Amino acid sequence: MAFVPVIPESYSHVLAEFESLDPLLSALRLDSSRLKCTSIAVSRKWLALGSSGGGLHLIQKEGWKHRLFLSHREGAISQVACCLHDDDYVAVATSQGLVVVWELNQERRGKPEQMYVSSEHKGRRVTALCWDTAILRVFVGDHAGKVSAIKLNTSKQAKAAAAFVMFPVQTITTVDSCVVQLDYLDGRLLISSLTRSFLCDTEREKFWKIGNKERDGEYGACFFPGRCSGGQQPLIYCARPGSRMWEVNFDGEVISTHQFKKLLSLPPLPVITLRSEPQYDHTAGSSQSLSFPKLLHLSEHCVLTWTERGIYIFIPQNVQVLLWSEVKDIQDVAVCRNELFCLHLNGKVSHLSLISVERCVERLLRRGLWNLAARTCCLFQNSVIASRARKTLTADKLEHLKSQLDHGTYNDLISQLEELILKFEPLDSACSSRRSSISSHESFSILDSGIYRIISSRRGSQSDEDSCSLHSQTLSEDERFKEFTSQQEEDLPDQCCGSHGNEDNVSHAPVMFETDKNETFLPFGIPLPFRSPSPLVSLQAVKESVSSFVRKTTEKIGTLHTSPDLKVRPELRGDEQSCEEDVSSDTCPKEEDTEEEKEVTSPPPEEDRFQELKVATAEAMTKLQDPLVLFESESLRMVLQEWLSHLEKTFAMKDFSGVSDTDNSSMKLNQDVLLVNESKKGILDEDNEKEKRDSLGNEESVDKTACECVRSPRESLDDLFQICSPCAIASGLRNDLAELTTLCLELNVLNSKIKSTSGHVDHTLQQYSPEILACQFLKKYFFLLNLKRAKESIKLSYSNSPSVWDTFIEGLKEMASSNPVYMEMEKGDLPTRLKLLDDEVPFDSPLLVVYATRLYEKFGESALRSLIKFFPSILPSDIIQLCHHHPAEFLAYLDSLVKSRPEDQRSSFLESLLQPESLRLDWLLLAVSLDAPPSTSTMDDEGYPRPHSHLLSWGYSQLILHLIKLPADFITKEKMTDICRSCGFWPGYLILCLELERRREAFTNIVYLNDMSLMEGDNGWIPETVEEWKLLLHLIQSKSTRPAPQESLNGSLSDGPSPINVENVALLLAKAMGPDRAWSLLQECGLALELSEKFTRTCDILRIAEKRQRALIQSMLEKCDRFLWSQQA
């Protein structure tokens, strides 16, 4: 693997292509030689693509869904413009010079409507379109220099009057040459032609020429909006020859000229794309003398332009080149916020994002693009090392990235990453370690016991008495979230284009500890890289830490430990690391530490207990290798139950408190999910009780106070979640524990006989139902479970027990609660939250279902429909559990999911979702029960179909028919038939009857439905034998003898489809068997006398037709015979 060159300059931003639009163009058939994309525009909601065939495709940016197609017969689409302040309007110009303004009517769910068609520029080439920023007005410029305005009226009365009284098209001006670009802001229209730029006050109808010097060629101009908060006036930037720009004030006066010629001599930055690996050439080129054909305002500080060679982004106020990259053959560019949509000369469209380097790497990491992320880090080393980037790209993330790369393939890349990590964090910076949560504005001293005394350097601290809370030992969740969000705000696209010199503006204020007792604190457990010398010292540290609550001292005692084996799983990314590390946040002292001690002490009893679990785990894993155990369910359950007893003994709530206290009292408090204000109250209450117990000389009471102050051993079992491990677990052992614990859940081995310290057998857990046992198992061993396997097991084994699913979701919520993305999901509307979910959460994250749950709780069914884009990360089986209280909403999701596939793929797609097969009947029963007509409309009192009831509207008829037509075994088909009959879904019932060869039942129900169309046409059910015809005629006779005629749905026999009676069936019989055989069969059934003259005439016509047909056939045969004989002669 070649060595990746390092870009010497510290570039803060890069252009990145995270997704390709080629599949979209292919689906729209805009990638052929006959039809291609000719124009492009973008707004907050839409991506508009004009085609050479005159069609305008409107694609919803959320999910890239094709929503509308607007056709034009006046030629190819040459220009498109979306109204930025109202997404419901779009303007297009055709190759013939017509301008059409459309109202999309998306909010009212109506059909798009042509608001106005302007022929003002007919016969000319429209070169520019621009919308007013406040009202519905479109400015149009053509190649002859004419500029006009189309003012729209939205009310119906105004539309009607416009044709007779008003003149919606107004000629603004005619400039001396072709209009290159139009831009509008705050009542001013900016016109750039081939020779100069003009500023027009459209309200007062005044015009100014910008500058005195003319130019010759295509040069753009754009407005540069000022900052509203700072009262800054908008500016204008006009392109000039030789890579120059004029900076112009809002009155049209040239302020200064900016020269970018020498700045553009630097090599181009690579575009980060999945199509190829980024390449960088250090060779500096000569200065570029360019003409900028258009200027576009991008984000907040930047101006974008392009040439045939590449894309250039400037910060004109600072006379800086933010970046330039080689992107070939660009025809046009549309921008929205920090997004660029580039239309190329061959009709292709590329989607680029202007993004900071650190955020680019983060997005690549979330998508699992390890090679590309590593190369980007190595290319932009100077940017990654910058202080601002280090807050986002921590060394832990770089270590995790390195662990994902294959040593054989990416050896050079791994060595470069290692060098980067060394630069990122020097080895001797102990107090600034990447795993330390102590603020750099705090100092600490080491006491004789090995405890670190943290000394805050903040000013204006509160009283000593208030500073003694548990929260003072760790950073609060709120403060960490504020720090994180401040980093995120720095990376917002709209503010990402600041100058290079602005990186030092990051706030470095010291962390302030909240100490108000009445405030609710959220404990936030995070490992610290400080270890005391031995377990005994660590125990003494806990005692002193607990005593500090009673004495109300001002010292902050930290006894938190980091894991000696901290290592992230390879498959985990981003924020998932916090929940599924190979070693949990809290650790036990390492054996090496005890060996270093000169004082020989006997190991505490908890180590023996943990050693016992290791032996039991190794023994259980060995037994699982035996096929006689692995494939025999009873033997497997016995092995798991025996092992589970050791696990319960080790992690028992009562007996394991000593381990927790020995490790870290405050970290143990942080692992359990409790109401924090209650935990604080418990701390103060237990402090008072501890003082009383001290008078009895009970030394152990001090050791247990930190744990018992928050919970009781067994009474609060139902309220606790063990999210993270209470002590350090080696990587190999943790994997074995996870495998066995998950296997216990899958095989429903959820408890065993536990012997307490008093020696008796505890049967309390065995008295509960399986659902309660499963919930308790999840809460106790959540930190050991394989979350993906656990989720699937719960869906299969406890599909009818919503409490188990709810418990699992609660555990995931607790895991995600410390994630800033989870906090951010509480803000904004549904599209904003969906975009955040799409950008920030990996699709393979087990926490994805939690975010989906939050969206559903907030937005209901609309959120479910939006979750279709996350399939297959979120499956229908997840959704049905998520909304088990509202099955109708699940059915709406399932119907939308199936309809999102092409028509010819829906059946196979639905079949792939039916795992297990039992879901078929469940979903069918749900579909025929919801949004269905009342049973009184489909069946009579005897259970037979009412006439024409098969024509009633069913909300999910297409989904039902898809389910029915899928292949299945005989028993399943019979059950589906019974479901359709009991619910009165007669179209499906008839299909299933004919599949099961229950033709007698089918014809019986067809007669009751009284619709001849069921027996006509290519898909009609026509009797195949004489016996079936006799049966059908007999059924009609029986029906006609009933005392009251069956009324149609409309209440009249004359309305609706043709009824099934003797004459209509006789006519069908005559057409199928011939008039003579039909007559004889009718006579045999005694129905010949009931026929009218119409039947007789029809039979006569059929006889004549048959005679002519026979004659024609005979004639053709004779001609063929003569022809063949002539050929032989």
Curated annotation (Swiss-Prot):
It holds the Pfam family Beta-prop_HPS5. The modification Phosphoserine is found at S532, S534, S695. It comes from the Eukaryota. Residues 564-576 have a biased composition (Basic and acidic residues). One of its GO terms (biological process) is blood coagulation. The keyword Phosphoprotein applies. Its main location: cytoplasm. Coiled coil: none annotated. Keywords: Albinism, Cytoplasm, Disease variant, Hermansky-Pudlak syndrome, Phosphoprotein. One of its GO terms (cellular component) is early endosome. The keyword Lipid biosynthesis does not apply. Residues 483-503, 561-609 are annotated as: Disordered. InterPro entries: Beta-prop_HPS5-like (IPR056499), HPS5 (IPR035431), TPR_HPS5 (IPR056445), WD40/YVTN_repeat-like_dom_sf (IPR015943), WD40_repeat_dom_sf (IPR036322). It is found in: Cytoplasm, Cytosol. Widely expressed. Isoform 1:Highly expressed in lungs and testis. Isoform 2:Highly expressed in placenta, kidney, testis ovary, lung and thymus. Component of the biogenesis of lysosome-related organelles complex-2 (or BLOC2) composed of HPS3, HPS5 and HPS6. Interacts with HPS6. Interacts with HPS3. May interact with all alpha-integrin chains that have an aromatic residue before the first lysine of the conserved KXGFFKR motif, including ITGA2, ITGA3, ITGA5 and ITGA6. May regulate the synthesis and function of lysosomes and of highly specialized organelles, such as melanosomes and platelet dense granules. Regulates intracellular vesicular trafficking in fibroblasts. May be involved in the regulation of general functions of integrins. Belongs to the HPS5 family. It is linked to Hermansky-Pudlak syndrome 5: A form of Hermansky-Pudlak syndrome, a genetically heterogeneous autosomal recessive disorder characterized by oculocutaneous albinism, bleeding due to platelet storage pool deficiency, and lysosomal storage defects. This syndrome results from defects of diverse cytoplasmic organelles including melanosomes, platelet dense granules and lysosomes. Ceroid storage in the lungs is associated with pulmonary fibrosis, a common cause of premature death in individuals with HPS. This is BLOC-2 complex member HPS5. The lineage of its organism: Eukaryota, Metazoa, Chordata, Craniata, Vertebrata.
